[in-house]
Design a protein with these regions (language model features):
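Trp/Phe/Arg-rich N-terminal binding region typifying the photolyase-homology
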Residues: 1-127
Length: 127
């Protein structure tokens, strides 16, 4: 359920899909070059799969999101530097929430070690 073509939103008709990359210069905690390269390959792979479905798609840096214009819809980034960047730069997006995330959030209140006890229940719910 993590790739676009099998997500909750696969039947939505989007005009264009932007895949957002967050390079080290935008991060407060720098990632290793191996991690940056791995993430870049994941994004390029997703771009190709979307284009294979004849959907217009472009990879952009997170700093370019503010230049897209209004009426932007995005998967909710939950936590981390992407959400922090959007908030710090006052970038307003209309978020889409995956059913998997919405269901799982109820178990996200006492850290990972408590959450992991619910993983089998979450998997059962979505398989």
């Amino acid at each position: 359920n993590l790739s676009f073509e099998t997500s909750d939103f696969k039947d939505f008709k989007f005009k264009k899909i932007y895949l957002v990359s967050n390079k080290n210069e935008n991060r407060s905690i720098k990632l290793s070059e191996k991690v940056i390269k791995f993430k870049s390959h994941l994004i390029k792979d997703q771009e190709q799969r979307i284009k294979n479905q004849s959907i217009e798609c472009e990879i952009i840096d997170i700093s370019e999101v503010k230049n897209i214009g209004e009426n932007i819809v995005s998967l909710y980034p939950t936590v981390g530097e992407n959400l922090d960047y959007l908030n710090l730069n006052n970038i307003k997006l209309n978020f889409l929430y995956r059913k998997l995330d919405q269901f799982s959030w109820q178990y996200c209140n006492k850290g990972f070690f408590n959450f992991k006890n619910y993983i089998p229940k979450i998997i059962t719910m979505f398989t």
